[in-house]
Amino acid sequence: MDINLIKQYINSSLPNDKESLIQYYGQLKQILNALSDKEQQQLLNNNGKISEQQQLSIENNYKVIGSIEEKMKSIEHLFNNLDVSDSNNNNSTSPVFISLDNQNTVNNNNNNNNNNNNNNNNNNNNNNNSLAPTVILDNNDNKKTAEIILPDHHNNTPQQQPEQQVQQQQVQQQQQVQQQQQQPEQQQQHLTEEQIQKQQQSQASIQQAIANMGEKKRSSSRHSGPPEIPPEEIKFDVKTDLLGGGAYGKVYKATCRGKKVAVKVPKKQTLSESELKSFKNEVEIMKQIFHPNVVLCLGACTKPGKVMIVSELMQTDLEKLIHSSEVEPPPLYERMKMCLDAALGINWLHGICNIIHRDLKLANLMISKDKTVKIGDFGFSQVIKTGTTLSDQKGPKGTALYMAPEVMMKHEFNEKADVYSFGLILYEMATCEELFPEYSEIDPFYDAICNKKLRPPIPDSFPKSLKTLIQKCWDHDPNKRPSFNEVTQRMNEVLTDTAISGLDAAMFWKYNFIKPESESVPWNEFVYKLSSVVNLPTQVLSPLAQLFVSQSYEEEIGGVVTMERFDLMNKWFGNFFNSKYGPAILYEMIELLKKRWFHFDISRDISEKRLRGRPENTFLLRLSANDPIKTPFTISKTKGSKPTHKRVSREDVQINEIKQFPMGYKFTVPLDGNELVFGSITQMVEELHRIGNLSIPCPITEIKVPYLTD
């Protein structure tokens, strides 16, 4: 298990709804059990003798275990408080949430008061610790509810408690809560201010999550995982609601309890014992996963003839998006962001859940309405212990085009089989071409992949980081393929190289800002780095936020600079981050911002609307998106009562021309059959205004003028 990934999960903010918080708690419990088993096994394997490096690893793991336990107990404690309050208000006669932490509190008090019985009490503590709270779900009254409960300490079968015993238990429960509330006050006397502040922040975040849950009816049913959904509650039309299908069955758009969902209906509805086991295995795997890049399982129906899996509804999948004959695929950068989404989801499956997907392909990478990519279809997925391998005795499972050679050859395999599939996905997403179109038969394809080690040709135009990652992922030797943790890190470099076209600009960004999820950087951090490179004060550069800060981030404090915006700025203005030419370019940019005639990067259509009805030669200057490197600026003006547009070209200058053109560029504009050359944009506009070619700067407002064609 990836300890760094686990730490990120523990430190992540809590979900805002009750169902997600319950799943989060269950995931913490699974991680805790896995880490504990790992440490015990390591000690057994070494007969209690461990190296210094192993000792450090174990100590690190124990710290993580402690963090998990602390977070779980905080959640249990707050659930307990919530339900004691509910029971007081509703005269409830059965406690719903029983915190394990409460039981430990009582035992610890007994230990302090009865020194002669230390051994017995310690044994009781150990027994209590082994009985972790259980997550249960229920569907009574058409409402899905969730609870955290403790296993019965005395009986193996549930039974009704006498009313007197229930009341006594409620009194004990309230006393335990009071003891818990008093304990932190005593403990805080021994904590530093920083520790107290962190504790208060943690409690506040959990309280906020609890507050967002709303009031839901609770039940004492003992079901686990996604709820069993009655088939009559899943409503869809087999003729009009079909989303897709394959050998396994079909997927429909449906409605369940008022929510739009996707429902997977296996082709075979009368399942044998082994088939039912396989179906339940898929549901069991899906219910363990809670991650923004994995499709969420909402429930299942296992009634014979009505077998279905219900999950969140997605908009489309990558196969339809990339290979559609009707719509152009998104830009390369957007496609690589989608690949990063997929990598993050698979990294979670491998690192936290120990799940191998086994059928990664574009059709199984779903896209939500907000363009987030999520992993779907766990029909062939398997849980695998860290460091072990699997093999297909009855033949390989998955899709042949994406299948790793070791799987195809029925050799032992592990999670690196998914890495191979991702390499082909990455290639397909980058080229938008179908894989291996020259093969239609399995035998020649098998020979090409397994024996000849054939892979698709990678275009020379690909960034080096992308080429290297693809080649590493589809390496014939599984041991040479990277882990998905490494894949996600390398994808950040790929994103930089695909978002920023200029080599110097990409190097500047990588050196100063590249880090996990570094698609943007706060403006304050960006301007500080830029200031140190060009040796200009940040106060001088601060007006440039109007150009650099992305429009969609205006509400954030200070704003952010995205890689895409940084790339555009580099194309429009050149290497403004260069220590030699940068200061001159940046001063020119600051001067432009002072001019009334500079209208930023508005479109041609908007510029014409602003010029309509204006006097002759009213003008504006705008940044051009058509060819921002060769013709970065456009002069739009009125001529004969109609808008006209004239592009301004830019080209590099020779070394002996630097004194005349200090920005390292010269700008050319056509006029009356001639080409006028200038050292800056402001100089060009001033000269054109002097000779009468341009007159009044255009305001940013529009005049509503009716046209005959309107």
From Swiss-Prot:
Can you list the GO cellular component terms from the UniProt entry? cytoplasm; membrane
Report what the protein is called. Answer: Dual specificity protein kinase shkE
Record localization: Membrane
Gene Ontology terms: biological process? signal transduction
State if ATP-binding is listed as a keyword: yes
What does the sequence similarity comment in the record state about its family?
Belongs to the protein kinase superfamily. Ser/Thr protein kinase family. SH2 domain-containing protein kinase subfamily.
Spell out the Low complexity composition-biased ranges: 83-94, 107-129, 197-208
According to the record, the residues making up region (Disordered) are 83-136, 189-232
- Function, as annotated: Required for proper chemotaxis and phagocytosis; proper spatiotemporal control of F-actin levels in chemotaxing cells. Negative regulator of the PI3K (phosphatidylinositol 3 kinase) pathway. Predominantly phosphorylates serines and threonines and tyrosines at a lower level.
Q: Which InterPro entries match?
A: Kinase-like_dom_sf (IPR011009), Prot_kinase_dom (IPR000719), Protein_kinase_ATP_BS (IPR017441), Ser-Thr/Tyr_kinase_cat_dom (IPR001245), Ser/Thr_kinase_AS (IPR008271), Ser/Thr_Kinases-Pseudokinases (IPR051681), SH2 (IPR000980), SH2_dom_sf (IPR036860)
Binding-site residues, ATP: 243-251, 264
| Species per Swiss-Prot/TrEMBL record | Dictyostelium discoideum
The top EC class is: transferase
Known catalytic reactions: L-seryl-[protein] + ATP = O-phospho-L-seryl-[protein] + ADP + H(+); L-threonyl-[protein] + ATP = O-phospho-L-threonyl-[protein] + ADP + H(+)
Question: Which GO terms label this protein's molecular function in UniProt?
Answer: ATP binding; protein serine kinase activity; protein serine/threonine kinase activity; protein tyrosine kinase activity
Q: Name a Pfam family for this protein.
A: SH2
Keywords of the record? ATP-binding, Kinase, Membrane, Nucleotide-binding, Serine/threonine-protein kinase, Transferase, Tyrosine-protein kinase
PANTHER family membership: DUAL SPECIFICITY PROTEIN KINASE SHKE, SERINE/THREONINE-PROTEIN KINASE TNNI3K-RELATED
